[in-house]
Amino acid sequence: VYDAYRPQSAVDHFVRWAEDLEDTAMQPCFYPEEEKSRLFAHGYIAARSGHSRGSTVDLTLLDEASGKELDMGGTFDYFGAPSHTDYDGLTPEQRANRALLRDAMLRHGFRGIKTEWWHFTLQEEPFPDTYFDFPVRAPD
């Protein structure tokens, strides 16, 4: 699991970061093919998130024997075409791995989005209109 519940205050921080067009330090890693000014329009950043409703999870699959992540043909939180579920540049193995993840999540009541192969939201959300903002703390 890469990400699950995210307080609304953390989402607000992402929004402030995305609105600061001068801060492009992360562009080479996370959005080299995108203009930062287009991250909202392309759906990579939003003022509201299913993560803050406690109903969205970002995840991948691991190989049981090795404990290593399966090759999904792209990295988590990459804002660009390789993250799209229907990306044409995937190998057959990568396509099969994405299908395995998608099918497992669909079977368990989650739906994905087109722009992020790792992002799934519970279809029958218990709090569809509530954006929580309680803090998350590491255990002592």
Q: Which residue ranges define each predicted feature?
A:
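Cell-envelope/glycan interface and biosynthesis
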Residues: 1-139
